[in-house]
Regions:
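N-terminal membrane-proximal hinge/A-helix region immediately C-terminal to the signal-anchor transmembrane segment
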Residues: 1-89, 102, 106, 121-122, ...
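Cytochrome P450 heme-thiolate monooxygenase catalytic core
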Residues: 1-10, 74-85, 103, 119-279, ...
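Cytochrome P450 proximal C-terminal region
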Residues: 2-6, 10, 37-38, 131, ...
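Cytochrome P450 I-helix active-site segment
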Residues: 7-20, 124-128, 179-185, 239-247, ...
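Short, conserved phosphate/pyrophosphate- and ester-handling motifs at nucleotide-, phospho-/glycolipid
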Residues: 59, 273, 357
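Cytochrome P450 heme-thiolate "Cys pocket" and heme-binding signature region
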Residues: 92-93, 267-268, 272, 309-310, ...
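Cytochrome P450 catalytic-core helices
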Residues: 276-295, 299-301, 411-426
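Conserved cytochrome P450 K-helix/beta-meander segment immediately N-terminal to the heme-binding cysteine loop
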Residues: 362-389
Length: 459
């Protein structure tokens, strides 16, 4: 194996190969990380400077050590926030995604009530209302045009659901303005956008031109203006808040929360609902369309359950096959495809020394394809999550993270995914437009290089 040395010395990527790998990480990080793992193994160091260590790990045992066993030593850290290639820190601020230590503990304690069973179930009427609107729209559309751009529709619907359930169900939001600013901000933070910026800056520098990338700031300014207006209205009690904004207002009145805190949590919730859940639903619907036998089996599962328990609401039913499908979708296309941590103190992982201040990178995309745990890891196979097959793979599967900092909104996301996928399947048969497997991009979220389009046939 290239770069292999003493088993307890972390393989170091040769200096002459660093530029190639660095460009690869900016241009196509999923492919680049996979290639480096093939060459250097499950742990290796991309050392860009004398005192810097960017250590990639790709084994469940190492991941468990970082995210659970010694998680106190591995926080996001200032270095991770400041060097984030996606520039998320100015977007998400110090909200639940980016905070650390005692600050994170306090936020988690404040927000976890939003994800209790009671709180989650209280969002059902709004989920059903927005889903009903989408189904009605599609039912009319498919009469003349059966092709639907699923991703955009899911993004719009999830944004509506989030704003109504977590901000207010009384406001008439300017959904288009919020949607355009969010999509623009996310795209401007993509690795491809950053690569284009770096290339242009490098080209113009010899001409004495100091090129600065400002497009993301324009979108962020729009989002900040929207957030500021919403926060002002909340504090002045101009509308009845729901979910997140209700608990933030209560905390604000106790002088425990600032305007900035409310703004940051708003951005965190919008991002999570807007992109991660919507994208996960998109890929789930794609897999149903791409594998018609599985779609038929899931439909039969739904029909049988409804027939046996006609008085039980669909949100309270168990659908084992659908759950296998969703889990396999999240394995292949984990919305958050990488995690970064900073080692506060020096440590040892399976005998490998980890210097203090090292940046640790975990790619869930690569981990979910580790050949030791996922044979034929690029192939779609819902049997991967049958009880016997999944045994011992807890830390080989981390679409929501793992350990103490596992995504606080996991239960809500899974609840929304099941209800929405079930609702769509009851009304439409799904078919792919092309038999070719979609190519993917790792921006902030894993998406297709082209929009995911499906053919819908009304049942």
């Amino acid at each position: 194996m290239e770069g292999a040395v003493d088993s307890k010395t972390i393989p170091l990527i040769p200096g002459h190969k660093i530029p190639v790998h660095a460009v690869g990480l900016l241009n196509n990080p999923l492919k680049a990380i996979s290639k480096m793992i093939d060459s250097y193994g499950d742990i290796f160091n991309l050392k860009l400077a004398k005192d810097s260590n960017i250590i990639f790990v790709n084994h469940p045992d190492y991941v468990k050590h970082i995210l659970k066993d010694n998680q106190a030593n591995y926080s996001r850290g200032n270095a991770v926030k400041q060097s984030s290639i996606t520039g998320l820190h100015d977007f998400l601020g110090n909200g639940i995604f980016m905070s650390d230590d005692e600050d994170w503990e306090a936020q988690h304690k404040l927000l976890k009530g939003l994800f209790s069973v009671t709180a989650i179930e209280s969002t059902l009427p709004i989920i059903e209302d927005e889903l009903g609107k989408l189904i009605a729209k599609w039912s009319h559309q498919v009469i003349n045009n059966p092709t639907v751009e699923v991703e955009e529709e899911m993004l719009l619907m999830m944004m509506h659901i989030m704003l109504r359930t977590q901000v207010s169900n009384e406001l008439n939001f300017d959904y288009n303005a919020i949607f355009n600013a969010l999509t623009g901000r996310v795209e401007a933070s993509s690795v491809k956008a950053l690569f284009r910026y770096q290339l242009k800056a490098f080209t113009l520098k010899p001409l004495g031109i100091n090129y600065k990338y400002t497009k993301h700031q324009e979108y962020l300014d729009t989002l900040n203006a929207i957030a500021d207006k919403l926060v002002s209205g909340l504090i002045n009690e101009e509308y009845k808040p729901s979910g997140l904004f209700a608990i933030m207002l209560a905390d604000y009145k106790l002088n425990k929360t600032t305007r900035t805190d409310i703004r940051d949590q708003f951005m965190n919730f919008v991002f999570a609902a807007f992109d991660t859940t919507a994208t996960a639903i998109t890929w789930t619907l794609y897999h149903l369309a791409a594998y018609p036998k599985i779609q038929q089996q899931v439909n039969e599962e739904l029909a049988t359950s409804i027939q046996k328990e006609p008085d039980t609401h669909i949100s309270n039913r168990q659908f084992p096959l659908l759950q296998l499908l969703i889990k396999e979708t999240l394995r292949l296309y984990p919305p958050v495809w990488s995690y970064a941590r900073e080692a506060a103190e020096s440590d040892t992982i399976n005998g490998y020394p980890i210097p203090a201040k090292s940046i640790i990178v975990i790619s869930s995309y690569a981990l979910h394809r580790h050949p030791e745990f996922w044979p034929s890891g690029d192939n779609f196979n819902i049997a991967n999550f049958e009880k016997e097959n999944f045994k011992g793979k807890t830390f080989a599967y981390i679409p929501f993270g793992q350990g103490k900092r596992m995504c606080v909104g996991r239960a809500l996301a899974e609840y929304q995914m099941q209800i929405i996928v079930e609702g769509i399947l009851q009304q439409f048969h799904l078919e792919t437009i092309s038999k070719k497997k979609p190519e993917i991009n790792a921006n902030i979220i894993i998406k297709g290089t082209e929009p995911v389009r499906l053919k819908l046939v009304k049942r």
